[in-house]
From Swiss-Prot:
UniProt keyword annotation of Acetylation present: no
Entries under PROSITE patterns matching the protein: SIRTUIN
Source organism per UniProt: Streptomyces coelicolor (strain ATCC BAA-471 / A3(2) / M145)
CDD domains: SIRT4
Enzyme Commission number: 2.3.1.286
Cofactors named for this entry: Zn(2+)
Name this polypeptide is given: NAD-dependent protein deacetylase 1
């Protein structure tokens, strides 16, 4: 039986209250040297839900674990059916004002880098460069046998051919690209193997129960060491993969600033948490800095 990932903290318990004052965020960016750490909350305005915010998908959806995926063919079939259907929507998501604001900060030399916990590629689509995808990307798939990486669009084409007419109506989409389907809707969905060696294909993302590659973690730690401050955008910081960088920055005496509507696990380490929607908040900050944030058509 799969276990639902659980919270190891109580949101809002004896934590500093959020504010609506964006001045500290604007001041940090004006000073430069800011490292951005983004989470699922920055993509909700693009139609991709988060895990733990209001109405988050963990309330109705148990994400696939690495252990289940690698051990059980039926779990892989269920995953790929849901992911294939979800990709039709997920793959069409477009950057929102939050992503475009981050790209504008980067273009004007205010950032030292962007680390994202998201797997949607929307920072890059908005124009951000050198983005570190902490948890990988749904744009790629990897063979667990031969290690070959291939484009997700090619797998999508092969799955379409193997499952002609597969078009159940999903109840929703999740941050990991899964569509909400029942076992009956999954039916006899056919999974395709690696085109090179016939091995098992997996999205090039870090599943629950899987570790972020050590080299990637160290690269992120280097980015924290080189930054003047850390700006967290849309992350509850519930999992250690992101929280560790907040702790590192705070221990080094670097200001940590958070923009997230709900309480986060890192609030005690931050100089401020702005409790505002990300798109409008970051657009306001950009305006204060005299920066132009491109519209959706030009992002």
């Amino acid at each position: 039986m799969r276990m639902r990932p659980t919270l190891s903290w109580t949101p809002g318990a004896d934590l500093p209250p959020g504010t609506t004052d964006l001045a500290p965020v604007a001041d940090a960016l004006r000073a430069g040297g800011v490292l951005v750490l983004s989470g699922a909350g920055i993509s909700t305005e693009s139609g991709i839900p988060d895990y733990r915010g209001e109405g988050g998908s963990l309330s109705r959806h148990t994400p696939m674990t690495y252990q289940d995926f690698t051990a059980h063919p039926e779990a892989r079939r269920r995953y790929w059916a849901r992911s294939h259907l979800g990709w039709r929507t997920f793959g069409r998501a477009r950057p929102n004002a939050g992503h475009r604001s981050v790209a504008a900060f980067g273009r004007h030399g205010l950032l030292t880098g962007v680390i994202t916990q998201n797997v949607d590629g929307l920072h890059q689509a908005a124009g951000s460069e050198g983005v570190v995808e902490l948890h990988g990307s749904l744009d790629r798939v990897v063979c667990l046998s031969c290690g070959v990486l291939s484009p997700r669009r090619e797998l999508a084409r092969r799955l379409e051919e193997a499952n002609a007419g597969f078009s159940p109506v999903a109840a929703g989409i999740n941050p990991d690209g899964d569509a909400d389907l029942t076992d009956e809707q999954v039916g006899d969905f056919r999974v395709v193997p690696c085109a090179v060696c016939g091995g098992v294909l997996k999205p090039d993302v870090v599943f629950f129960g899987e570790n972020v590659p050590p080299r990637r973690v160290e690269h992120c730690r280097e980015l924290v060491r080189g930054a003047s401050s850390l700006l967290v955008l849309g992350s509850s910081l519930t999992v250690m993969s992101g929280l560790r960088f907040v702790r590192q920055a705070a221990e080094a005496g670097k200001p940590v600033l958070i923009v997230n509507r709900d309480a986060t696990r890192g609030d005690r380490l931050a100089v401020t948490r702005v409790a505002l929607p990300l798109g409008p908040a970051l657009t306001t900050v950009a305006d204060r800095l005299g920066l132009r944030v491109g519209d959706a058509a030009t992002a």
